[in-house]
């Protein structure tokens, strides 16, 4: 079920048809199941589609007047299907560092894309992670990245968002960026 809210300031909130388009420009017809006039100047449409959506794909919703909006993921993450398809039980999320390579892994099933940005030897780099099973994005860089600052650029619900690594313990001032740290070099004392 898709919920669409149209302002009555735009064609009186009326649309006789809706469809979606994915990132490959495939058209997906939508069926109006119900229509409600709301008190706040909007019309609420409940729409259905024949078939299933691919979680992580980005879809544009079109009305009959060619006005578009990005379909946003919200309630789908609370479904049994989502839990079955995207539960990830491994403990390798975040950064796995060795002096020869660093692997980045992020669980972001509703994201269209994830990139990592970092600075090495004064040069800014932005590299796309590859989508794998269960909504995990991963990338291995075959360089020594100890001490490097990094953050992720995630495209979800039609917007790019810069975020720090949710799996790391090492961040910069005010958590503005994450830091790759060789834990063996930290020499933490045991808690007494």
Question: Where does each model-flagged region fall?
Answer:
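A short glycine/threonine-centered beta-strand motif
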Residues: 2-14, 108-110
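Extended Gly/Ser/Thr-rich low-complexity repeat segments
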Residues: 12-21, 55-58, 119
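Aromatic- and glycine-rich beta-strand/loop motifs that create alpha-glucan
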Residues: 22-44, 98, 103-147, 153-170
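Beta-sandwich interaction modules
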Residues: 48-52
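Short, aromatic- and glycine-rich surface loops/edge beta-strands on solvent-exposed regions
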Residues: 54-67, 148-156
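Surface beta-strand/loop "capping" patches
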Residues: 88-92, 96-99
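Conserved small/polar residues in nucleotide/adenosyl-binding loops
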Residues: 186-192
């Amino acid at each position: 079920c898709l919920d669409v809210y149209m302002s009555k300031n735009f064609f009186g909130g009326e649309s006789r048809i809706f469809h979606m388009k994915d990132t490959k420009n495939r058209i997906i017809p939508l069926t109006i199941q119900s229509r409600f006039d709301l008190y706040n100047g909007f019309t609420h449409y409940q729409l259905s589609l024949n078939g299933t959506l691919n979680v992580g794909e980005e879809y544009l919703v079109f009305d009959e007047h060619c006005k578009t909006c990005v379909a946003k993921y919200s309630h789908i993450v609370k479904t049994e299907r989502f839990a079955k398809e995207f539960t990830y039980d491994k403990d390798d999320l975040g950064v796995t560092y060795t002096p020869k390579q660093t692997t980045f892994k992020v669980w972001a099933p509703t994201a269209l894309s994830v990139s990592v940005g970092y600075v090495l030897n004064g040069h800014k780099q932005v590299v796309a992670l590859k989508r794998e099973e269960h909504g995990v994005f991963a990338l291995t860089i075959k360089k020594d990245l100890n001490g490097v600052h990094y953050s992720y650029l995630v495209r979800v619900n039609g917007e790019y968002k810069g975020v720090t690594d949710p799996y790391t313990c090492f961040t910069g001032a005010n958590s503005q960026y994450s830091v790759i740290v060789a834990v063996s070099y930290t020499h933490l004392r045991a808690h007494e």
